[in-house]
UniProtKB/Swiss-Prot annotation:
Interacts (via effector domain) with RALBP1; during mitosis, recruits RALBP1 to the mitochondrion where it promotes DNM1L phosphorylation and mitochondrial fission. Interacts with EXOC2/Sec5 and EXOC8/Exo84; binding to EXOC2 and EXOC8 is mutually exclusive. Interacts with Clostridium exoenzyme C3. Interacts with RALGPS1. Interacts with LPAR1 and LPAR2. Interacts with GRK2 in response to LPAR1 activation. RALA and GRK2 binding to LPAR1 is mutually exclusive. Interacts with CDC42. GTP binds at residues 21-28, 68-72, 127-130. This is Ras-related protein Ral-A. The modification Cysteine methyl ester is found at residue 203. Multifunctional GTPase involved in a variety of cellular processes including gene expression, cell migration, cell proliferation, oncogenic transformation and membrane trafficking. Accomplishes its multiple functions by interacting with distinct downstream effectors. Acts as a GTP sensor for GTP-dependent exocytosis of dense core vesicles. Key regulator of LPAR1 signaling and competes with GRK2 for binding to LPAR1 thus affecting the signaling properties of the receptor. Required for anchorage-independent proliferation of transformed cells. It comes from Rattus norvegicus (Rat).
Amino acid sequence: MAANKPKGQNSLALHKVIMVGSGGVGKSALTLQFMYDEFVEDYEPTKADSYRKKVVLDGEEVQIDILDTAGQEDYAAIRDNYFRSGEGFLCVFSITEMESFAATADFREQILRVKEDENVPFLLVGNKSDLEDKRQVSVEEAKNRADQWNVNYVETSAKTRANVDKVFFDLMREIRARKMEDSKEKNGKKKRKSLAKRIRERCCIL
């Protein structure tokens, strides 16, 4: 009799997170801090880097897959493909750069266009909270935008690690809740189809 195989990575729930935002706002720094507990200040502009990690989410072991996309306009054309594969989005700007905050509206619009879903799991993230003296975007301004979009707003610092775990775990919870919701809807449709089929069969017998 074969021994039971240990639970492999393939059987763990996988949550796919996409990092979006302008170049230089700290998307890669946040990702690397979450993955490796390291702050990397000088980082080459990313085309797209993918990371995977096992974490414990509310007592359950899961995998998170993080795709760190490029902020530069040169790569805008290939973003659609990345967005299609994502289940949730961390939309990052720097609190020290108003332009990067303004750009979040374009990223949000592009995501909604590709996903065709206004309720896609999404967090607005104001990074570089350690640079309070250089702040250009007020908390109130960012929260107002998040409220308009019906999403949560969190400020982070990749340097001090403030709220880094929080944004990834909060987004994973949103993704998980969405999957459960979709699964219920799917099962409901299957039950309705099955019931309709039984009614049709009964009508044929009669």
